[in-house]
Every structure is written in C-alpha cells, then in structure tokens.
Design a protein with these regions (language model features):
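C-terminal motif of bacterial Sec signal peptides marking the signal peptidase cleavage site
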Residues: 17-18
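Sec-dependent N-terminal signal peptides
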Residues: 6-14
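C-terminal binding/interaction regions
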Residues: 106-160
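Conserved SAM/SAH-binding beta-strand->alpha-helix loop
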Residues: 102
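Conserved mixed alpha/beta catalytic, RNA-binding, or beta-rich assembly cores of soluble enzyme
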Residues: 23-99, 121-122, 126-139
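N-terminal secretory signal peptides that target proteins for export/translocation
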Residues: 1-2
Length: 160
C-alpha cells in the first residue's frame, strides 16, 4: 500500500512540476500485468492504466467511453485472440505485448500494422470449460471488419 501511495505522490509531483514520466516499454507493461495478476495494461499520454476485468470487458469499455486512450498506445494483454486483436486494431494501438496470441489474433494485428510481441502462440483460446473456443473469439470468426466485430460483441455479450 505504501508503494502505491509513493508512486501516486511521485506522479502528482512530476505532473505538478511539468515533468513527464519516463516512457514504459511493452516488456515492462507485461511484467506489471503478470506481477499484479491483471488482464490489461495500457500506456498512453504519459500515464498507465491497469485493468483486471475478465474477457475483453475493459477493452469494450475503453472503446465505448474513452477511445482516444487506445490511439497509439502500448498495451499488455493477458491473451490475444480474435476479439482482443480486433478491438485493439479498432482502437489504433501501436504495440501489443502478451503471454499468448492465437494465429488469427496475430494475423489481425499484423494486417492492422500493430507490432505484436508474444511468448506463446496457438490455435485458439479455450472457453471456461476448456471444451472449445472462447465464445467471444468464435463470434468474430470470419469477420474482417473491426467495426462490425465491435458491434457483434456489443450485441451478443454487452446489451443484456
């Protein structure tokens, strides 16, 4: 708790005196994500935001309420499949670091010109029961347009 307060105090002091924080690279963001058991870390506009919601909930919220937060951002995401990759591409991030990327997620980010750094790559992300593909990713199978993908996810999972 003391470390969080100290970090906050340092950030406030730096902002007050017009100093900028030293840019954080993607490897550092991934370390933060893993060390703090988060699902998403976003670095942009001289600030870092930490998120711990399941699935792509935080990406959907950011795209809906503050899309400028992702434009040009460096992001660490726990797993990147179709859904996360499409949302990250739609948001205009510049770089993504992840522990695991699917082949299709990797392809989506490459086509969008997003730099991707990953530890492992595989066919798909499993659903919660480990019996098949993640339902969010399967919702976007065959959808190339990121706006359409966002709308489908919104309709199927978030408009209830």
């Amino acid at each position: 708790m003391k470390m969080k307060r100290l970090a906050l105090l340092l950030t406030v002091c730096l902002a007050f005196f017009g100093c900028k924080q030293k840019p954080v690279d993607g490897a550092q963001l991934l370390k933060i994500l893993n060390d703090e058991n988060l699902s998403l870390v976003v670095s942009n506009h001289d600030s870092i935001s930490r998120h711990a919601s399941p699935r792509v909930d935080d990406l959907m919220r950011i795209l809906t309420t503050e899309p400028e937060r992702l434009k040009g951002a460096v992001v660490a995401d726990k797993k990147v499949g179709n859904a996360a990759a499409s949302l990250l591409a739609l948001g205009g991030v510049s770089e993504v670091h992840t522990n695991y990327a699917t082949h299709s997620g990797k392809r989506i980010l490459e086509q969008a010109g997003v730099k991707l750094v990953y530890a492992r790559e595989g066919d798909f992300i499993f659903n919660n029961d480990s019996t098949g593909q993640c339902p969010m990713d399967s919702t976007l199978n065959g959808i190339a347009d990121h706006n359409e993908g966002f709308a489908r996810l919104q309709e199927k999972f978030y408009n209830k």
